[in-house]
Amino acid sequence: MSIGLLCCAALSLLWAGPVNAGVTQTPKFQVLKTGQSMTLQCAQDMNHEYMSWYRQDPGMGLRLIHYSVGAGITDQGEVPNGYNVSRSTTEDFPLRLLSAAPSQTSVYFCASSY
């Protein structure tokens, strides 16, 4: 590949502009004291039926906490203890941490798909 073609490809990506990810997770960062509760919000605007919450602990892969296959339908994943979820609409799937423990220090991810 020539340098000229590579530069054009890089510039094309830069000019593409921002893209809406379709899934919004808030808050981005949160620090809790042991015993505190909190809710992580997850919203998607793509009309996806499937939504899921994952956690990734240091040195480990993603582990499924809870998932949903449609509004009003939720189920437990691999590590559901200490968490509650609800799915009153297709768009929203909040994850509630009931009582923070040091073992729940993790990176949390929400995902959606068809």
From Swiss-Prot:
Glycosylation positions in this chain: N84
A cellular component term, taken from the record's GO annotations: plasma membrane
One Pfam assignment: V-set
Sorted UniProt keywords: Adaptive immunity, Cell membrane, Disulfide bond, Glycoprotein, Immunity, Immunoglobulin domain, Membrane, Receptor, Signal, T cell receptor
InterPro entries found in the cross-reference section: Ig-like_dom, Ig-like_dom_sf, Ig-like_fold, Ig_V-set, TCR_beta_variable
Signal peptide: 1-21
Lineage top rank: taxon: Eukaryota
Chief site of localization: membrane
UniProt domain Ig-like: residue ranges: 22-114
Localization (cell): Cell membrane
GO biological process: adaptive immune response; cell surface receptor signaling pathway
Disulfide bonds: C42-C110
Known partners and oligomeric status: Alpha-beta TR is a heterodimer composed of an alpha and beta chain; disulfide-linked. The alpha-beta TR is associated with the transmembrane signaling CD3 coreceptor proteins to form the TR-CD3 (TcR or TCR). The assembly of alpha-beta TR heterodimers with CD3 occurs in the endoplasmic reticulum where a single alpha-beta TR heterodimer associates with one CD3D-CD3E heterodimer, one CD3G-CD3E heterodimer and one CD247 homodimer forming a stable octameric structure. CD3D-CD3E and CD3G-CD3E heterodimers preferentially associate with TR alpha and TR beta chains, respectively.
Function: V region of the variable domain of T cell receptor (TR) beta chain that participates in the antigen recognition. Alpha-beta T cell receptors are antigen specific receptors which are essential to the immune response and are present on the cell surface of T lymphocytes. Recognize peptide-major histocompatibility (MH) (pMH) complexes that are displayed by antigen presenting cells (APC), a prerequisite for efficient T cell adaptive immunity against pathogens.
Protein name from the UniProt record: T cell receptor beta variable 6-5
The species this protein was found in: Homo sapiens (Human)
Gene expressing this chain: TRBV6-5
